[in-house]
Curated annotation (Swiss-Prot):
Post-translational modification N6-(pyridoxal phosphate)lysine, affected residues: K230
PANTHER family: SERINE HYDROXYMETHYLTRANSFERASE
NCBIfam families from the UniProt entry: PRK00011.1
Species, as recorded: Cupriavidus pinatubonensis (strain JMP 134 / LMG 1197) (Cupriavidus necator (strain JMP 134))
Protein known as: Serine hydroxymethyltransferase 1
Any Pfam family: SHMT
Plays an important role in substrate specificity (site feature) positions: H229
Primary gene name: glyA1
Record-linked CDD domains: SHMT
Gene3D superfamilies found in the cross-reference section: Aspartate Aminotransferase, domain 1 (3.90.1150.10), Type I PLP-dependent aspartate aminotransferase-like (Major domain) (3.40.640.10)
Biological function: Catalyzes the reversible interconversion of serine and glycine with tetrahydrofolate (THF) serving as the one-carbon carrier. This reaction serves as the major source of one-carbon groups required for the biosynthesis of purines, thymidylate, methionine, and other important biomolecules. Also exhibits THF-independent aldolase activity toward beta-hydroxyamino acids, producing glycine and aldehydes, via a retro-aldol mechanism.
Length: 415
């Protein structure tokens, strides 16, 4: 028997407890600007820490290979119903353990090794699971990539021409570092014209899409994959949305195709997050995410930094650092010393190596969760620029860190 009072983390494992406490303090003290990170609600975390972690549930609601699944069936069906409502989807699978596995599930459902796929080039903003040479998607399939035009928007004309020439079996839209709106309808028409499947990976934009502040790909795509964290503000995991005609193939692809027992405690967290995302408060939050990102970009531009594509129409932006004579790797480290957390990121046609880069990726979801609005976004933009203007001045870094501390104390993550 486990007596709850005797089995607390601090008693059983002081080392892990200490690390958790330090990470909690870091999240409170630092302004999180990594576009793919966010803060989940205590309700989501409570679901993930529940007894559902004990339950094996291979299969799907009503069709399990284990007994005792009547209550986890309720949880999974709630998650399915809510995510379908959230995005207007015909069918959904909430079992993928990650966005990458959601993508893999689609590939296994409709492709064979050697088939041709077409996705956005990783070097110009795509994702490694869309055909990068070192990723399984690049090893198992013949990959052709589309990219950006001179205005650093997706080159839709070139995309269409390439699709007509190469006749891929699957066209993929979606990105990990692209700030503008993606014309899912146009790409969907290209796919239809050549008889290709169309998959959208909306992992970065899902929260914005749920709130109606970014185009919804669901009406135009055969499959839509997403993570459930990032802008959606749920637990770490994945989801596949699909047309009803593909539901059986996708379900078989996930189980028994690439996964065994689903993580029911995480699916519970997904269900809670989807319920939160259906509220008016979540819509208002996403509207503020977009406003904050726009102000952040405008501030950085005013301070002499170049934003790839010249602006953002979403939650994310790429900042070209070459004018400041600093690499993304160095900027990430120095901004971190000032308690501003960003990630190094390649810019289009980046001359630097992938682990060095000429840019950083900056996003607004996490700081907006804290309660930041336009005024704070402007302050953050100026603080970033202050660091980059004098990156090797210890006094400057200390001054910025003090200003960050004043902000984070006013806006705690978990009050």
């Amino acid at each position: 028997m486990f007596e709850r009072s005797r089995y607390t983390i601090d008693q059983i494992d002081p080392e892990v407890f200490a690390a958790i406490q330090k990470e909690n303090q870091r999240q409170e003290d630092h302004i999180e600007l990594i576009a793919s990170e966010n803060y989940t609600s205590p309700a989501v975390m409570a679901a993930q820490g529940s007894q559902l972690t004990n339950k094996y549930a291979e299969g799907y609601p009503g069709k399990r290979y284990y007994g005792g699944c009547e209550y986890v069936d309720i949880v999974e069906q709630l998650a399915i119903d809510r995510v379908k409502q959230l995005f207007g989807a015909e069918a959904a699978n909430v079992q993928p353990n990650s966005g990458s596995q959601a993508n893999q599930g689609v590939y296994f459902a409709v492709l064979k090794p050697g088939d041709t796929i077409m996705g956005m080039s990783l070097a110009e903003g795509g994702h490694l699971t869309h055909g990068m040479a070192l990723n399984m998607s690049g090893k198992w399939f013949n990959v052709v990539s589309y990219g950006l035009n001179a205005q650093e928007d997706i080159d839709y004309d070139a995309l269409e021409k390439l699709a007509q020439e190469k006749k891929p079996k699957l066209i993929i839209a979606g990105a990990s570092a692209f700030a503008l709106r993606i014309d899912f309808e146009r790409i969907g028409k290209v796919a239809k014209s050549i008889g290709a499947y169309f998959m959208v990976d909306m992992a970065h934009y899902a929260g914005l899409i749920a709130a109606g502040v970014y185009p919804n790909p669901v009406p135009h795509a055969d499959f839509v994959t997403t993570t459930t964290h990032k802008s959606l503000r749920g637990p770490r995991g994945g989801v596949i949305l699909m047309k009803a005609e593909h539901e059986k193939a996708i379900n078989s692809s996930i189980f028994p195709g690439i996964q065994g027992g689903p993580l029911m405690h995480v699916i519970a967290g997904k269900a809670v997050a989807f319920k939160e995302a259906l509220t008016p408060e979540f819509k208002a939050y996403q509207e503020q995410v977009v406003k904050n990102a726009a102000v952040l970009a405008e501030t950085l531009i005013a301070r002499g930094l170049r934003i790839v594509s010249g602006r953002t129409e979403s939650h994310v932006m790429l900042v070209d650092l070459r004018a400041k004579n600093i690499t993304g790797k160095e900027a990430e480290r120095i901004l971190g010393e000032a308690h501003l957390t960003v990630n190094k990121n390649a810019i289009p046609n980046d001359p630097e190596k992938p682990f060095v880069t000429s840019g950083i990726r900056v996003g607004s979801p996490a700081m907006t969760t804290r309660g930041f609005k336009e005024e704070e976004a402007r302050i953050v933009g100026n603080l970033i620029a202050d660091v980059l203007d004098n990156p090797h001045d210890a006094g400057n870094i200390a001054s910025v860190r003090e200003q960050v501390s004043a902000l984070t104390k006013r806006f705690p993550v978990y009050g």
